[in-house]
Amino acid sequence: MTQDKCPFKEQPSQPNFAGGGTSNKDWWPDRLKLNILRQHTAVSNPLDADFDYAAAFKSLDYEALKKDLRALMTDSQDWWPADFGHYGGLFIRMAWHSAGTYRVFDGRGGAGQGQQRFAPLNSWPDNVSLDKARRLLWPIKQKYGNKISWADLMILTGNVALESMGFKTFGFAGGRPDTWEADEATYWGRETTWLGNDARYAKGFSGSDKRGTLIADEDSHKTTHSRELETPLAAAHMGLIYVNPEGPDGNPDPIAAAHDIRDTFGRMAMNDEETVALIAGGHTFGKTHGAAPADNVGKEPEAAGLEAQGLGWANKHGSGKGPDTITSGLEVTWTKTPTQWSNNFLEYLFKFEWELTKSPAGAHQWVAKNADEIIPHAYDASKKRKPTMLTTDLSLRFDPAYEKIARRFLEHPDQFADAFARAWFKLTHRDMGPRARYLGPEVPSEVLIWQDPIPAVNHPLVDASDIATLKDEILASGVPFRSFISTAWAAASTFRGSDKRGGANGARIRLAPQRDWEANNQPWLREALSALEAVQSRFNSRGDGKKVSLADLIVLAGCAAVEKAAQDAGHPIKVPFVPGRMDASQEETDVQSFSHMEPFADGFRNFAKGPARPRAEHYLVDKAQLLNLSAPEMTVLVGGLRVLNTNYDGSAHGVFTSRPGALSNDFFVHLLDMNTAWKDAGNGELFEGSDRKTGGKKWTATRADLVFGSNAELRAIAEVYASNDGDMKFVKDFVAAWNKVMNLDRFDLKGKQTIPARL
């Protein structure tokens, strides 16, 4: 008898209590991660159930808070002294790294939940010393309590830091309620070493076990990795926000670094001008820290001992702070006025020729040739240094497109200041969603295209009588009801709880690029929109001032069709509807930005393409998480949408019913029927169900169908709906979940700024 190799790595000593020991994840690492549908609920939130963050923020003495933050900037503490007597550079980096994890593909990351406080972000090599920044802020957070979240405070502090150093910002919006646990839904990469990128790139770098510094790799890796960064990632290395400042994989090549910069910043929604403005503007202030080699740096916060109290990277070099600080391993101060806004960065970038050198920690950086020592020392006023730059700074000079922009900014400082102000605002607010969520006295009045603007309601809304009339007209239009349901779902399910983008409001389903997405059945979409536009035209031409938007009609049509389907199944029920949506124009829609939201898969519609198909069930859970759904909500929606016959291509996969179009619990009844035997149809993506006795073919199904009978937790939920007493509960739960999805983007209704509940 042979002994199989253990399916998991040997683990450090674990307690035999409190969840210790070998876990299901250890045994089956590829198991469906339903835990991401159970996060950020009332169970983990210490605040009262009726706590309203928006109301709390509005009661904040905002100017007093900003005054306290300004005072903190120059209140240097012995336990962590301020460079140049000013914490501005540190706090700008804190805010930047809080927001800079955002990526366009799934909207995850960003500043919106204050996740920098939790693992893994609190222990990333790129966030060394930001643990100290947050501790410097604690007395102010303690003073103002729940009136300002950590998520808002970190961004506001970055703004105040800029203002205190003479820069005029574009504005600030609050409205980021905190979460209370580490986010487990975001994919940060598969590498198992800090700074590694051998999984996200072909020919990548295996990483390092060193902590806290970016030591150039001199021996094992001389070939720059390929340029195809894994989707949805937006960082070149595990544990970095964007790129390696030494250059790709530690190779000091400014041209190659420009490729990485353009890719990663683009995946964070920044164009070339915004990228140049952010790098040049941000590096106008402060310095980097690399006083000594990496072996002086201790464990990161998550690995440090209890006595460290959540701090990490203890530094045994000298005093371990001030002039002895080790953060990135680079030792660069960009300008002669590191606590004042200036054009020095761009002036020096083009004025000097640059020579490759190394920091005291051994990291590649650049020093100005034949330059005078004009750069101040952070802690000794009697000392000066030559100007220094990072490899990625020089990219702004040697990449032709970046150089053109940088020279224009050099010649036109006013354009540079405006571009940096706007790019900084976009960086720090990109994941907040619509302006309806913005709070505070410094919200800028200018409406920006990346905010996905929707016109304000400018007419009387339809009332209950109008709604009833419209529903009757819609149902009598002759359009198959599944087209209305499919269109409503296609519109509403674009919502992402990550960055609060998408949803039915705006009716962008009729505009490029959404109208052309493969997942949106084109004939069904066209016939539904054509019928609804005719209904809208007739209603809005009545002359009584009342109007109805196409966005409202899309949702109303779906609701009316669901009501009819429930009635046809013998379960009359009212599907809620609240008007107030408006229609966006094509000019108000950033096509490139929205193109990133096109789904690879949507298991609710049995849609998956390319590499998504073999993992359709995992994509389904990911989609459910973005829709703020719980496992029961996901389950009931899939079961309902199947019997409503709304597969994106009209196929019968998973349509386990003899009465398609009726809102019944048939999907669950037939899925769990032990008289059906399932077999793989040959590719692991499609399955056939046959009668166990006769062998006759009964059903076909995808992975997104059979997972509800295969996965133990989902099967337990499915059993509730498949039971003899589960039919009415199924209909009620489906309608509740449907209504939730239809209104995920209705921040105008919610009032409260909370993390949407997973019921």
Curated annotation (Swiss-Prot):
<comment type="similarity">
    <text>Belongs to the peroxidase family. Peroxidase/catalase subfamily.</text>
</comment>
<keyword id="KW-0479">Metal-binding</keyword>
<feature type="binding site" description="axial binding residue">
    <location>
        <position position="283"/>
    </location>
    <ligand>
        <name>heme b</name>
    </ligand>
</feature>
<keyword id="KW-0963">Cytoplasm</keyword>
<feature type="region of interest" description="Disordered">
    <location>
        <begin position="1"/>
        <end position="24"/>
    </location>
</feature>
<keyword id="KW-0575">Peroxidase</keyword>
<feature type="active site" description="Proton acceptor">
    <location>
        <position position="97"/>
    </location>
</feature>
<keyword id="KW-0408">Iron</keyword>
<feature type="site" description="Transition state stabilizer">
    <location>
        <position position="93"/>
    </location>
</feature>
<dbReference type="GO" id="GO:0004096">
    <property type="term" value="F:catalase activity"/>
</dbReference>
<dbReference type="GO" id="GO:0042744">
    <property type="term" value="P:hydrogen peroxide catabolic process"/>
</dbReference>
<protein>
    <recommendedName>
        <fullName>Catalase-peroxidase</fullName>
        <ecNumber>1.11.1.21</ecNumber>
    </recommendedName>
</protein>
<keyword id="KW-0560">Oxidoreductase</keyword>
<comment type="subunit">
    <text>Homodimer or homotetramer.</text>
</comment>
<comment type="function">
    <text>Bifunctional enzyme with both catalase and broad-spectrum peroxidase activity.</text>
</comment>
<keyword id="KW-0376">Hydrogen peroxide</keyword>
<dbReference type="InterPro" id="IPR000763">
    <property type="entry name" value="Catalase_peroxidase"/>
</dbReference>
<dbReference type="InterPro" id="IPR019793">
    <property type="entry name" value="Peroxidases_heam-ligand_BS"/>
</dbReference>
<feature type="cross-link" description="Tryptophyl-tyrosyl-methioninium (Tyr-Met) (with W-96)">
    <location>
        <begin position="242"/>
        <end position="268"/>
    </location>
</feature>
<dbReference type="GO" id="GO:0005829">
    <property type="term" value="C:cytosol"/>
</dbReference>
<dbReference type="GO" id="GO:0070301">
    <property type="term" value="P:cellular response to hydrogen peroxide"/>
</dbReference>
<keyword id="KW-0349">Heme</keyword>
<dbReference type="Pfam" id="PF00141">
    <property type="entry name" value="peroxidase"/>
</dbReference>
<dbReference type="InterPro" id="IPR010255">
    <property type="entry name" value="Haem_peroxidase_sf"/>
</dbReference>
<dbReference type="InterPro" id="IPR002016">
    <property type="entry name" value="Haem_peroxidase"/>
</dbReference>
<dbReference type="InterPro" id="IPR019794">
    <property type="entry name" value="Peroxidases_AS"/>
</dbReference>
<dbReference type="GO" id="GO:0046872">
    <property type="term" value="F:metal ion binding"/>
</dbReference>
<feature type="cross-link" description="Tryptophyl-tyrosyl-methioninium (Trp-Tyr) (with M-268)">
    <location>
        <begin position="96"/>
        <end position="242"/>
    </location>
</feature>
<dbReference type="GO" id="GO:0020037">
    <property type="term" value="F:heme binding"/>
</dbReference>
